[in-house]
Amino acid sequence: MSEHTFARASHLSELEAESIHILRETVAEFANPVMLYSIGKDSQVLLHLARKAFHPAPLPFPLLHVDTTWKFRDMYAFRDAFVARHGLRLIIHRNQRALAEGINPFDHGSQKYTHAMKTQALLEALAAHGFDAAFGGARRDEEKSRAKERVFSFRDRHGQWDPRRQRPELWNLFNGRVDAGESMRVFPLSNWTELDVWHYVLRERIPVVPLYFAAERPVIDRGGTLLMVDDERMRLRPGEKPEIRRVRFRTLGCYPLSGAIESSATTVETVIHEMVNARQSERQGRLIDHDEEGSMELKKREGYF
């Protein structure tokens, strides 16, 4: 093993140990935790860490998928197969009122759509099941508002985040005290980077959604963003015509709001090689991050994960 490879392995092991400590600490401090499962690579890594943390026992908490009904078909297929294969407890929650009103990413815009189908749906699910802590796979390197968020992120009785009320976190000490109605969002992957995640996927052979790998897919170019035409609900603007391009996704969300990148990376190793030379943000293709200045922080203040 080369010195560089040994250093990488040691670094990943340190991150793994830290995340497992956070998972166990949360389960010890809270009465009713849950893990948000968005089906992406970070969720897969977090779930893998959780299964390690509590092995050989089953997970001491369920998974929660906030379903907008607009995820990629490959994501739904992967979710159902993975959960069934491993016998996991999965709660699927949808904002039924928003669905009845026909809220969608085309007619209502990304802000209203995200607030209704993601933020409000998440708050509904947490309240309905009485969860006092919710794990998420967010990382500090993803976006500037996440960069300043604590591992234990306190939320008030309305599920909202106030950056000025964050608690100090000294070394590996976490304050999980909450009053009735308050809760905590917990981010065990806070100190990981996108590259760390992919190296860990490679080391642990963690399965991920095929959309992360390059393949011939039907896309349209909308203002410089490549959007995949995943089903018949995709609305084309005048002059738009789907064309087949070799693309993959660095981050996955709702398909009308997730941009692809042209790529030839078909394996984890080639994705890592591509990542080393990347000069653009991982979330550049997430259109919900760009609907206004400070968009992510505003969403998090409202209760978004």
From Swiss-Prot:
Example GO biological process: hydrogen sulfide biosynthetic process
Top-level taxon of origin: Bacteria
Major enzyme class: transferase
EC number: 2.7.7.4
The entry's keywords: ATP-binding, Nucleotide-binding, Nucleotidyltransferase, Transferase
Signal peptide: none
SUPFAM superfamilies the UniProt entry points to: Adenine nucleotide alpha hydrolases-like (SSF52402)
Molecular function, one GO term: sulfate adenylyltransferase (ATP) activity
Quaternary structure (record): Heterodimer composed of CysD, the smaller subunit, and CysN.
UniProt-recorded name of the protein: Sulfate adenylyltransferase subunit 2
Organism, as annotated: Myxococcus xanthus (strain DK1622)
Gene name tied to this protein: cysD
